[in-house]
UniProtKB/Swiss-Prot annotation:
Binding site residues for (2S)-2-hydroxy-3-oxobutyl phosphate: A85, T86, R127
Active site positions: H88 (proton donor)
One Pfam family named in its UniProt record: DMRL_synthase
Gene3D superfamilies: Lumazine/riboflavin synthase
GO BP terms in the entry: riboflavin biosynthetic process
Binding site for 5-amino-6-(D-ribitylamino)uracil: F22, A56, F57, E58, A80, V81, I82, F113
Keywords, in A-Z order: Riboflavin biosynthesis, Transferase
Pathway assigned to this chain's UniProt record: Cofactor biosynthesis; riboflavin biosynthesis; riboflavin from 2-hydroxy-3-oxobutyl phosphate and 5-amino-6-(D-ribitylamino)uracil: step 1/2
Protein name: 6,7-dimethyl-8-ribityllumazine synthase
Function: Catalyzes the formation of 6,7-dimethyl-8-ribityllumazine by condensation of 5-amino-6-(D-ribitylamino)uracil with 3,4-dihydroxy-2-butanone 4-phosphate. This is the penultimate step in the biosynthesis of riboflavin.
Class of this enzyme: transferase
EC number: 2.5.1.78
GO CC annotations on file: cytosol; riboflavin synthase complex
Gene assigned in the entry: ribH
Length: 154
């Protein structure tokens, strides 16, 4: 039996990160977590490129643009969609997750879903580096592992 696993080293990887400006007090912490993870695992700052978009709904189109370039080993998508009193949360979170998954499958580039979808602001804050770790850091770990796994399977 042959088992394949991606290494957890970011040396030589080029990573694009897309960050939603909406709820920036949360998303900036997710971005910091992603960058911290990439650098701790050997990525050079020059190999990390960040695109800010207005909101989470705009993430998939920029993910597609970045994944299409053939320049990135992975694209990390970061945002924070927090439930409110209207169904807007359901529409946005559903379409963003579908869009990100579609890009990854279509372009065969790891496009990592690091968009928080929470019921409360408190839950988002917890997942951005307080109680529940930093989901931006976790997204970067997934990007590293998946990038290296894709290289093995090529």
């Amino acid at each position: 039996m042959k088992i394949y696993e991606g290494k957890l080293t970011a040396e030589g990887l080029k990573v694009g990160i897309i960050v939603s400006r909406f709820n920036e007090f949360i998303t900036s912490k997710l971005l910091a977590g992603s960058i911290d993870c990439l650098k701790r695992h050997g990525a050079k700052e020059d190999n990390i490129e960040v695109c800010w978009v207005p909101g989470a709904f705009e993430i998939p189109v920029i993910a597609k643009k970045m994944a299409s370039k053939g320049k990135y080993d992975a694209v990390i998508c970061l945002g924070a969609v927090i439930r409110g009193a209207t169904p807007h949360f359901d529409y946005v979170s559903s379409e963003v997750s579908k869009g990100v998954a579609h890009v990854s499958l279509d372009k065969e580039v790891p496009v990592i879903f690091g968009v928080l979808t929470t019921n409360t602001i408190e839950q988002a804050i917890e997942r951005a580096g307080t109680k529940a770790g930093n989901k931006g850091y976790d997204a970067a770990m997934s990007a590293i592992e998946m990038s290296n796994l894709m290289k093995i399977l090529d």
